[in-house]
Amino acid sequence: WGCLRLPLPLCHALAAHCRCPASHTLRCREPLTVSSLSALLLGAHRPTDVIIENQALLTSLTRDDTRMLWDLRHLTISNSGLQYISDDAFQDNHRLSHVNLSFNALTSLSWKTFQHLPLQELTLEGNPFNCSCGIRWLQLWQNGSRAELGNQSLLCWEGSMLVALDSHPLHDCEPPTARIEHPDVVLRQGDSVNLTCHIWGEPSATGEWVLPHVGSEPSVTKLSEWELVLEINNISSSLNHKDLTCRAENSVGLAEDSVMLNVTFPPVILLLSEAIPQHFWCIPFSVDSNPTPRILWLFNGSMLPEGPYIHTRIVEYEPNSTVLHGCLQLNRPTHVNNGNYTLVVQNPLGRAARSIQGRFMDNPFSFSPEEPIPVSISPLGTRNSSLEGPVETADEHTFGVSVAVALAVFASLFLSVMLIALNKCGHRSKFGINRSAVLAPEDGLAMSLHFMTLGSSPVSSTESKLDGLKSNFIENPQYFCNACVHHVQRRDIVLKWELGEGAFGKVFLAECSHLLPEQEKTLVAVKALKEVTENARLDFQREAELLTVLQHEHIVKFYGVCTEGDPLIMVFEYMKHGDLNRFLRSHGPDAKILDQGQGQPCGQLTLSHMLQIATQIASGMVYLASLHFVHRDLATRNCLVGHDLVVKIGDFGMSRDIYSTDYYRVGGRTMLPIRWMPPESILYRKFTTESDIWSFGVVLWEIFTYGKQPWYQLSNTEAIECITQGRELERPRTCPSEVYDIMQSCWQREPQQRSIQDIHSRLQALVKTPPIYLDILG
């Protein structure tokens, strides 16, 4: 059989005179062995290339012969007896692009046979065509070099003379024309329309109207050989933006003219679904209207004002349609946004409305944070139950004053006794009393802001078995200068939406009244504690005291706490651009890829911008080092970006949830950011201000790689091996050598050789005179 790589069923199905020299190729060359293509391919696999030559018995080709060749791309029938090809011979061969019909017995050939094909090459040399209107289309194609016909020498018989087709005049053989005479086609739903089509051609042309589904039955009237009138009554909105086409054709070719109807109608709500969580929450809807409708929303029956955080977004326009697909987009909605949402669409012709319930989260409070907190008063006597409220008597007033005075005297005596006792107990320390900060068991990184540890805090296996890790704080006016934690009234806090969630609880964007004297309302980030155990409350209190101490322009500002009821709340300043890692990625060269083409493109950070960011973080680190505070988790994910590229150190405790791949779990609960840790911290769990400097070097590397993960090509175990063996991160392509030298200064093997003051000074110098950097690797 001589078959190579062809599926076995095809080889068995072919006649013995055909060959399959390549996969999916059929070749029949032995003379007088093929009379029908359909019989040859019966029951066979479908080839993509068919080559038939020297077959005088093969005289016709119809749709029945080719209907099973769905994958046919190349067809050759040459040196055969082919005389006739039907108009629909290739109706089912939508991939056919190369046709060779050379040296057959074709005297005529219709353009209709090839009109729907993606034809790249049509070979017709050696056929005895008659010079007639039936091959005028070939002359036009040849003169226009379509389907490679311009490179062929086609001949036709004019009587007994064989002439060149491309230059032979074929009289009275022209393609038809079609023209729709139409009035103003802006119609209202329910109107009627009459359209007249004028057709012409030589030889004479036939005409027809090609219509979409129009609902009511259209009427077509033939006024003459040249005029067709279309009448449609009770126009439907489904005809809006639909084409009505008049088609004329003759033996030379085809002509069409179309008109698009513009049907106006009142708005219709096609879809309104329940809210679905995406990167944001979306209440999806679809509406249809012409003209374009006004879209607005009601929330619990009142007008919903739209802004940057709640707004309507059209996500898709259907081509040649008035249907709009969109959603009401809610960024980080909270329980405040739960309620009834009504979509209202209207245009000059009418109005439509539909409602749906939206529920985004449960109320994290036992009461509405927008309402005043009820204060319960234990009755000291008979209360007035009238609507005017309680009436205070003179006796009650005298009694109240007496109680207040007695309490004040008692408090003074108690404080005096406590001070004497403290002085006696503390005589062994020349600095005074000791204070301890207890971290969560087995998790030195459990606190949301890691300013809990002073100086060095090595973690041993023995200590990990204790109930908590204790570090002694030296009494110093800088640390505990009678720091008074500011208390914020819960009624002054109005939650807007959730920013994120961590192991401790949730962080919300909120609006706080009376927080700053120069502003009536201030946007803040609110951290709500999930646990309400006694240990959690103690940790909350200690953290609040420490955060109150930290006051620096590049440390996230702590405003205070709210302890009225549950949950316990910490209030921080709000940094509008979020964490630095995402900010770097969205302003880097791969921003469009990471965003998947969505959203507005951000400008790419320059060398000057990156140096400014690094210097600000270094400034915050100098401040922490001066207080001997150890951060323990310094990374771009734990820095926040505000207005005008202001960068501050801070961490709301969400990073271990959002950036979980940046942490390595040790034992049961401990999550360590090993890619940012120096060898002494990995090997001995020793965290110092010097270990923070190592982490700062990695932060520099993150900045100059636009937020890439350190050692991103390695697993956590492989990264640990590289760090402990002394390998360093490679210099980023966008990083000048002067900056890489600073990184390497942070990665000195000996901790005492790392100096944050020196690093900060060098960065400040680079900001003033940025290095000239040429990207020779790019």
From Swiss-Prot:
Cystine pairs: 18-20, 133-173, 282-327
Enzyme Commission number(s) of this protein: 2.7.10.1
Domain of life: Eukaryota
Entry keywords, A to Z: ATP-binding, Cell membrane, Developmental protein, Differentiation, Disulfide bond, Endosome, Glycoprotein, Immunoglobulin domain, Kinase, Leucine-rich repeat, Membrane, Neurogenesis, Nucleotide-binding, Phosphoprotein, Receptor, Repeat, Signal, Transferase, Transmembrane, Transmembrane helix, Tyrosine-protein kinase, Ubl conjugation
Post-translational events: Ligand-mediated auto-phosphorylation.
Residues listed as glycosylation sites in the UniProt record: 100, 130, 143, 151, 194, 234, 262, 300, 320, 340, 384
Keyword Nuclease: no
InterPro entries attached to this UniProt entry: Cys-rich_flank_reg_C, Ig-like_dom, Ig-like_dom_sf, Ig-like_fold, Ig_I-set, Ig_sub, Kinase-like_dom_sf, Leu-rich_rpt
Subcellular location per the Swiss-Prot or TrEMBL entry: Cell membrane; Early endosome membrane; Late endosome membrane; Recycling endosome membrane
Catalytic activity: L-tyrosyl-[protein] + ATP = O-phospho-L-tyrosyl-[protein] + ADP + H(+)
Activity regulation annotation text: The pro-survival signaling effect of NTRK1 in neurons requires its endocytosis into signaling early endosomes and its retrograde axonal transport.
Membrane topology of this protein: Single-pass type I membrane protein
Domain Ig-like C2-type, residue spans: 175-262, 281-347
Residues in the Cytoplasmic compartment per record: 422-778
Main enzyme class: transferase
Annotated GO CC locations: axon; early endosome membrane; late endosome membrane; plasma membrane; receptor complex; recycling endosome membrane
Signal sequence, renumbered to the chain: 1-14
Function: Receptor tyrosine kinase involved in the development and the maturation of the central and peripheral nervous systems through regulation of proliferation, differentiation and survival of sympathetic and nervous neurons. High affinity receptor for NGF which is its primary ligand, it can also bind and be activated by NTF3/neurotrophin-3. Upon dimeric NGF ligand-binding, undergoes homodimerization, autophosphorylation and activation.
Protein name: High affinity nerve growth factor receptor
Source organism per UniProt: Gallus gallus
UniProt lineage: Eukaryota, Metazoa, Chordata, Craniata, Vertebrata
